């Protein structure tokens, strides 16, 4: 897969009371689903899944195998995001690199999975106080595939009145 880089510059502040935007990274529309897995394992196409209501390949659907099916046909966090580079105002820590872990909370950021029909699994990065206190000046997202990056108000993932796509 080809890596894609997205850079977002923000007005820096080290005020922890100011809410910081959440970055939601989604596979682009054409990359949202694993076409080979749908075709070779489940014998359906992306169009069958998206547009013809062939949601699941079995009649015995339950919440556990529905989630397993969705995870099998969409991309995990590490498949989508290679790393984030965050530049700060700090003289001692001018740049921080974050290599995400599945659903893991790391020192400077937490990643949450967002489930969508349009983009498959998306991943929202919420900066922690440790990095916010350094004053973020730039966020560079290096993706493993074509992605959309949404800037959301915290807690309002993909709401049409509270997001921007970069």
Model-based region annotation:
Residues 1-166:
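Non-transmembrane functional regions of membrane and envelope proteins
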């Amino acid at each position: 897969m080809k890596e894609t880089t997205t850079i977002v510059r923000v007005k820096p502040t080290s005020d922890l009371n100011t809410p910081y935007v959440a970055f939601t990274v989604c596979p682009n529309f054409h990359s949202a689903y694993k076409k080979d897995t749908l075709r070779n394992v489940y014998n359906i196409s992306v169009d069958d899944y998206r547009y013809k209501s062939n949601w699941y390949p079995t009649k015995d659907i339950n919440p556990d195998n529905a989630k397993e099916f969705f995870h099998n046909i969409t991309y995990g966090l590490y498949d989508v995001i290679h790393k984030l580079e965050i530049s700060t105002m700090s003289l001692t820590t001018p740049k921080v690199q974050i290599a995400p872990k599945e659903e893991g909370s790391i020192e400077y950021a937490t990643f949450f999975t967002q489930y969508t029909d349009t983009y498959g699994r998306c991943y929202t990065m919420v900066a922690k106080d440790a990095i916010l206190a350094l004053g973020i000046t730039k966020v560079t997202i290096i993706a493993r595939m074509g992605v959309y990056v949404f800037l959301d108000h915290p807690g309002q993932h993909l709401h049409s009145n509270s997001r921007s796509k970069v």
